[in-house]
Design a protein with these regions (language model features):
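Non-catalytic nucleic-acid substrate-recognition regions in nucleic-acid-modifying enzymes
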Residues: 1-57
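A generic local secondary-structure boundary/capping motif
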Residues: 3-5, 51, 60-62, 106, ...
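Residue-level signature of catalytic and energy-coupling elements of molecular machines
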Residues: 15, 63, 103
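Short glycine/proline-rich turn/loop motifs
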Residues: 18, 82-84, 169-170
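A generic beta-sheet turn/junction motif
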Residues: 56, 65-67, 122
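C-terminal edge-of-domain segments
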Residues: 61-74
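SAM-dependent Rossmann-like transferase core, predominantly class I methyltransferases
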Residues: 72-106
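Conserved S-adenosyl-L-methionine
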Residues: 95-172
């Protein structure tokens, strides 16, 4: 893999791994080996070493090893998609946002009648219902997606798609 196509000079990266294998028993070992291979390739090709940022990398890579198969992925989302971005403070909700939205969609409710939230703890069902009723996309409150830091990211195209209100979400 030509990592220069994905990690620009001056950008940071991180690797995390999930391992289910007899050969590789330690996911941390796999993480370090992949990171070292990328750093070594950069040094050989450019003479520079890319920086690592575990907490807030520009580029995040995931490696998944299942027995004798490995999959290396470039993270396009960043923070987990179930974190919608509408909460000011982190609360421990017994029901995550994606599950709440799924439950509402399975009922067929679209905002054209009353909705009763029998759990009404942290308000996750009520908030997701309001978003569905107003046809507000789930990711609209996110500060950023990981793909926005990619070299080939097209801000103009993203803004065009992001701000396009011509398509309503269809729930079946």
């Amino acid at each position: 893999i030509d990592w220069e196509q994905y990690i620009e000079k001056g950008k940071t990266f991180a690797v995390d791994s999930v391992v289910y294998s007899e050969e590789f028993r330690n996911s941390r070992f796999v993480t370090y080996k992949v990171k070292d291979a990328i750093v070594d390739q950069f040094r050989e090709e450019t003479g520079d070493r890319p920086n690592i940022s575990v907490s807030n990398p520009d580029i995040r890579l995931h490696i998944h090893i299942a027995e004798d198969e490995a999959t290396l992925c470039l993270d396009s989302s960043g923070e987990s998609l179930h974190r919608r971005g509408y909460r000011q403070e982190s609360v421990e909700a017994p029901l995550n946002e994606v599950l709440a939205a799924g439950i509402i969609m399975m009922t067929g409710w679209k905002g054209d009648c009353d909705l009763i939230d029998p759990m009404c703890g942290s308000g996750t069902i009520a908030i997701e219902a309001a978003l569905i009723a107003r046809n507000i996309s789930p990711g609209v409150f996110r500060k950023e997606f990981a793909f926005e830091k990619w070299q080939d990211f097209d801000q103009k195209l993203f803004d065009e798609i992001y701000n396009d209100d011509s398509q309503e979400r269809e729930f079946t």
